Amino acid sequence: MTDEKETRCSFCGKSQDEVGKLIAGTSGYICGDCIDLCHTLLHEEIEAEEDESADEIEEKLPTPHEIREHLDDYVIGQDYAKKVLAVALYNHYKRLRSGHKTDAVELSKSNVLLIGPTGSGKTLLAQTLARMLNVPFAMADATTLTEAGYVGEDVENIIQKLLQNCDYDTEKAEQGIIYIDEIDKITRKSANPSITRDVSGEGVQQALLKMIEGTIAAVPPQGGRKHPQQDMIRVDTSKILFICGGAFAGLDKIIEKRVHVGSGIGFNAEVKGEQDELTLTDLFKQIETEDLIKFGMIPEFIGRLPVIAPLSELDENALISILTEPKNALTKQYQALFGLEDVELEFTPESLKAMAKKALARKTGARGLRSIVEGILLDTMYDLPSQENLAKVIVDEDVIEKGEKPKLIFK
């Protein structure tokens, strides 16, 4: 009996009489109170780590001005679109940190619709934003999407791509950004609802609705196919920022028709002069929901993309700047590649102008610049590792306009 009374908890020192029951270990005892305390402390530590992780992201969240400045380092022009995106991104992640509610006011998602011609920087803007915040990023082509049950890519495959890009970490995926390109290609075939199935148009818009607004998407693990007995990974899409982009060719005519009431016919009609002509950018800034509905987007889908950022067409000066100014400018990239072979690469100002003109003629925007540069340097890069004593390669306007070889200068 004496030994029993002297048995005490190794942590708090209380006797067995005080605590009722002790659990014996290899070199001591622990009471129920200390077990509860340990459990509480461990739980608090786990919560603190989660809060610290959230605070870390909070601290990293840049202001709209800082977001805009970062975009300026990689994307030339598009000032209005950058400002719209900076505010939308900031508000979206602030919403996540607040738990979607502030004083019982529920904060809505600020998904973004980018409207602009091919090669104007829509994809680059989305990629740059994701890279800046170090969040997972996935890109999908709307033209490959179909409704579930039809041949093509299921809309939930987009979430799967996002999961793959963060090693299937659900929490990280739920803070990610998804960019859906060519969104203008999934318009319904007519402005009136159809009784026939439109599996790659209105049907896809309907399938994307819930995902963009916010739902719990069930995704098969590690890229497998769905089957009834399978355990699914569940992802809350209400926390994911969706950015959709498209050229929307012909939308400007719909806007112009609405904006310009005067038809220019009849004695009292308002005749438009040259000064009344609006640029594509000016027209897109006046876009209304009704214009997108007339274009073929369903009202419910447009309602899930409240932030619209129009991008302007790139002129010759903008294309020249794209070639030389950004941190990852094309000319800098190729100069770095040649530098690895201890060879200097020079582009004359005239050659830059010629490349910009060529891209404008092809109507491919900034996207076409890489293929132009790659084309003129292909043979040189092919021979480069075998060339001895090569010191410098010069690209002038004749290389672009006449198809001549770049000038080689040897040591």
From Swiss-Prot:
Task of the protein: ATP-dependent specificity component of the Clp protease. It directs the protease to specific substrates. Can perform chaperone functions in the absence of ClpP.
Entry keyword set: ATP-binding, Chaperone, Metal-binding, Nucleotide-binding, Zinc
NCBIfam families: clpX, PRK05342.1
Protein name per the record: ATP-dependent Clp protease ATP-binding subunit ClpX
Pfam families in UniProt: AAA_2, ClpB_D2-small, zf-C4_ClpX
Family annotation (InterPro entries): AAA+_ATPase (IPR003593), ATP-dep_Clp_protease_ClpX (IPR050052), ATPase_AAA_core (IPR003959), Clp_ATPase_C (IPR019489), Clp_protease_ATP-bd_su_ClpX (IPR004487), ClpX_bact (IPR046425), P-loop_NTPase (IPR027417), Znf_CppX_C4 (IPR010603)
PANTHER family, per database record: ATP-DEPENDENT CLP PROTEASE ATP-BINDING SUBUNIT CLPX-LIKE, MITOCHONDRIAL, ATP-DEPENDENT CLP PROTEASE ATP-BINDING SUBUNIT CLPX-LIKE, MITOCHONDRIAL-RELATED
Annotated Gene3D superfamilies: 1.10.8.60, ClpX chaperone, C4-type zinc finger domain, P-loop containing nucleotide triphosphate hydrolases
Top-level taxon: Bacteria
GO MF entry, a single one: unfolded protein binding
Subunit structure: Component of the ClpX-ClpP complex. Forms a hexameric ring that, in the presence of ATP, binds to fourteen ClpP subunits assembled into a disk-like structure with a central cavity, resembling the structure of eukaryotic proteasomes.
Residues reported to bind Zn(2+): 9, 12, 31, 34
Recorded GO CC terms: HslUV protease complex
Residues annotated as binding ATP: 117-124
Natural source organism: Actinobacillus succinogenes (strain ATCC 55618 / DSM 22257 / CCUG 43843 / 130Z)
Keyword Amino-acid biosynthesis: no
Boundaries of every ClpX-type ZB domain copy: 1-50
Family: Belongs to the ClpX chaperone family.
Bilayer-crossing regions: none
GO biological process: cell division; proteolysis involved in protein catabolic process
